Regions:
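Elongated, mostly alpha-helical coiled-coil "stalk/stator" tethers of large membrane protein machines
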Residues: 1-179
Length: 179
């Protein structure tokens, strides 16, 4: 994430927090990102320097007025005018980080060899919340490289309980033994 994205995303969060709109703006940013991912040609069009800025902002206005809060629309127009609309995902990420910090939320990703059952996911979620004392936003991923067990990534901190990690530790221990 660039410094520009941090600055813009943080500024939007500050504005939303002043008005008590943090959750609404977060949801709308997510929706706009999804729309732009589904329509990459539209993003290219909005980022084309040969089209006057006023026209590009007008396109945003036509597409989103009444669909998103005015703060989100104006934010997108500012990014469009500055030629930094491609920074939207970084701005949204910076916004989410500030939102999570303010609301006591930790993002966690559980990576396993097979999909977790709903019961396992619920149990893991509850355990992480009790250990951290924070609300957990848990995402799960499947990675065939994981032989067994689970690897957790909690905001950059990795907890590796996979069979691979245990085998590697055993290998290191055996190699360290001198006969």
């Amino acid at each position: 994430m660039t410094e520009t994205a941090k600055m813009y995303g943080g500024s939007l969060y500050d504005l939303a927090a002043e008005e008590g709109l943090e959750t609404r703006i977060l949801g709308e940013l997510d929706e706009v990102q999804k729309l732009l991912k589904q329509n990459p040609d539209y993003l290219r069009l909005l980022s084309t320097p040969s089209i006057p800025k006023k026209e590009r902002c007008g396109l945003l206005d036509e597409a989103l007025r009444g669909q998103v809060h005015l703060y989100v629309l104006n934010f997108l127009k500012i990014l469009c005018e500055k030629g930094t609309l491609r920074e939207l995902s970084g701005c949204a990420r910076a916004y989410r980080i500030r939102y999570n910090q303010a609301h006591g939320i930790l993002e966690a990703t559980a990576i396993s060899a097979v999909p977790l059952t709903e019961q396992q996911r619920v149990a893991l979620h509850a355990k992480l919340e009790s250990l951290t004392g924070k609300t957990i936003d848990l995402k799960t991923k499947v990675d065939a490289k994981v032989l067994g067990g689970i690897r957790l990534d909690i905001e950059g901190t990795e907890l590796d309980g996979t069979v691979q990690n245990r085998l590697a530790a055993l290998r290191r221990d055996i190699a360290a033994v001198t006969l």
